[in-house]
Amino acid sequence: MNKDAQMKAAINQKLIETGERERLKELLRAKLIECGWRDQLKAHCKDVINEKGVEHVTVDDLVAEITPKGRALVPDSVKKELLQRIRAFLAQHASL
């Protein structure tokens, strides 16, 4: 395992141990609902299903279709807030 992978694993482990990972996930979930991201993605899913026909769409097809759009629709403000929280966490746990 290279240095980057080791560092990533150590950070992830610390996030899990402290419960910060769950808090970050909950914050992300709330922010995405608040900004309408979830509703936009749900509407896009319905459009894809209606376009292709419910019998011709698998879950894997739907995931492949909506993942890029879902990532692109995340507002910059949400990304920045999460990044700020992660940086603050790393600053507190600089011994990693």
Curated annotation (Swiss-Prot):
Similarity-based family: Belongs to the ENY2 family.
Pfam families: EnY2
Keyword Transcription regulation in annotation: yes
Subcellular localization(s) per the UniProt record: Nucleus, Nucleoplasm
Keywords carried by this UniProt record: Activator, Chromatin regulator, mRNA transport, Nucleus, Protein transport, Transcription, Transcription regulation, Translocation, Transport
HAMAP family: ENY2_Sus1
Role description: Involved in mRNA export coupled transcription activation by association with both the TREX-2 and the SAGA complexes. The transcription regulatory histone acetylation (HAT) complex SAGA is a multiprotein complex that activates transcription by remodeling chromatin and mediating histone acetylation and deubiquitination. Within the SAGA complex, participates in a subcomplex that specifically deubiquitinates histones. The SAGA complex is recruited to specific gene promoters by activators, where it is required for transcription.
GO cellular component, one term: transcription export complex 2
Gene that encodes the chain: eny2
Name of the protein this chain belongs to: Transcription and mRNA export factor ENY2
GO MF entries: transcription coactivator activity
Subunit structure: Component of the nuclear pore complex (NPC)-associated TREX-2 complex (transcription and export complex 2). Component of the SAGA transcription coactivator-HAT complex. Within the SAGA complex, participates in a subcomplex of SAGA called the DUB module (deubiquitination module).
